[in-house]
């Protein structure tokens, strides 16, 4: 799902909550 993908990206960056907000 896009939400899980967003969480995965958020964990990798760790400094970009805006990325998670996009999902």
From Swiss-Prot:
Expression sites by tissue: Expressed by the venom gland.
A GO cellular component annotation in the UniProt record: extracellular region
Record family assignment: Belongs to the phospholipase A2 family. Group II subfamily. K49 sub-subfamily.
GO molecular function, a single term: toxin activity
Protein name: Phospholipase A2 homolog 4
Job description of the protein: Snake venom phospholipase A2 homolog that lacks enzymatic activity. Induces acute muscle damage after intramuscular injection in mice and disrupts negatively charged liposomes but not positively charged ones. Also exerts a weak anticoagulant effect only at concentrations of 40 ug/ml or higher. A model of myotoxic mechanism has been proposed: an apo Lys49-PLA2 is activated by the entrance of a hydrophobic molecule (e.g. fatty acid) at the hydrophobic channel of the protein leading to a reorientation of a monomer.
Signal peptide (from-to): none
Subcellular location: Secreted
Record keywords, A-Z: Blood coagulation cascade inhibiting toxin, Hemostasis impairing toxin, Myotoxin, Secreted, Toxin
Known partners and oligomeric status: Homodimer; non-covalently linked (probable alternative/compact dimer conformation in solution).
Provenance organism: Bothrops asper
Chief location category: secreted
Source taxon at top rank: Eukaryota
């Amino acid at each position: 799902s896009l939400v899980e993908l967003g969480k995965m990206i958020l964990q990798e960056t760790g400094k970009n909550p805006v990325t998670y907000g996009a999902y």
